[in-house]
């Protein structure tokens, strides 16, 4: 099993690769389809994985952004993400990791409290996004957003880096360190 | 004709009920019209049989002819539907004065029975009847849930006696779909109804997703996905699952916990707990759990044994 490192491979020409990690394959697949339909000047590649570590592969391109998808309806999905986080190189957490929580809209089905994922994202100093992936319009909007994030993390947007992005996003959505 | 063959003829013909006798003898077509006319069919059955065996001897019947007759007897439905209906109705009416019983013959040798129950003092309630479907070629009957549970033993008794069985057992299998119950009980669910292209790749076979996979999407855990698909297919098969709405597990087991200590862990008596799964189509939902990533494959045998065991209500105790 190889550990994923953010900068151990050369980037492909105009290529941006995102890795979606989550237990529910159907959701990841739908999100991937939506992302590929979004407007994008770069060439996109989407990798889907159930958990980390990934199986060994020489042909894998450099991963620019990792999004961990947690379904608030399923304790198993949170547990799997928590276990996967241990297998990630620390350098990724400098703006190349994001958390996505789905299922918040159906409160009666939620078995994970919102604060749990908020704390998780805070622990790993990464942005947290909420989106009900089952609803097509929300998913399309989130897909567009992720594509923009991905382009920045891949360095395709001049003047903005992944690290810049981190501090920008923290201000608007996530509470600062003092608040929690 | 030798002794054993004559005896075989005697016993085979004796088994035929008088109502079917002429039909079977004519289908067998071994004894001619003239010969049959010489037999007096009004005497006692033993005498009729004796006369018929003598005729067989005259015609030098062989073992083949005897076997042929035996096959015909098995083939023709020897179940007397009219007798069943009248016996069933009599039993209910003798026990309960106020009851309405009606019948309708249906396909596959089945009879639909409608029963409106009353009590000793009240007339039958025609608005809340119970329905029973009995398949005469099988030892199975299906009933709709009757609001008057107290009449179930009587119904069971009537079915048992009228169908000439010794006892009736209530199965722990319930569903709103008669066809699905039939499929499970007659073990007909594991036949594919559509032609299936066996060379379809595993990916296309899953849940309707991935039909035209974009080459820009790469599954990192392809090997695991294929394993899950394979295991699911081995357990559930390719065919559509019979339709059930519930699976209920009544647990009477000792509480087990990972945490050391805790109040419940120290209890000696079993903890009573009811777990109920409900779905518009339970078995299809269970089938899709592992491929969707919600559960690990293979699933617990408690869930996968439902069609095999013909049960969806379970009681589980510690061994």
UniProtKB/Swiss-Prot annotation, chain A:
Gene3D superfamilies: P-loop containing nucleotide triphosphate hydrolases. Keywords: Centromere, Chromosome, Cytoplasm, Kinetochore, Nucleus. It holds the Pfam family CENP-M. The keyword Nucleus applies. Its main location: nucleus. It is found in: Nucleus; Cytoplasm; Chromosome, Centromere, Kinetochore. GO terms for cellular component: cytoplasm; kinetochore; nucleus. It comes from the Eukaryota. Component of the CENPA-NAC (nucleosome-associated) complex, a complex that plays a central role in assembly of kinetochore proteins, mitotic progression and chromosome segregation. The CENPA-NAC complex recruits the CENPA-CAD (nucleosome distal) complex and may be involved in incorporation of newly synthesized CENPA into centromeres. Component of the CENPA-NAC complex, at least composed of CENPA, CENPC, CENPH, CENPM, CENPN, CENPT and CENPU. The CENPA-NAC complex interacts with the CENPA-CAD complex, composed of CENPI, CENPK, CENPL, CENPO, CENPP, CENPQ, CENPR and CENPS. This is Centromere protein M. It comes from Bos taurus. The gene is CENPM.
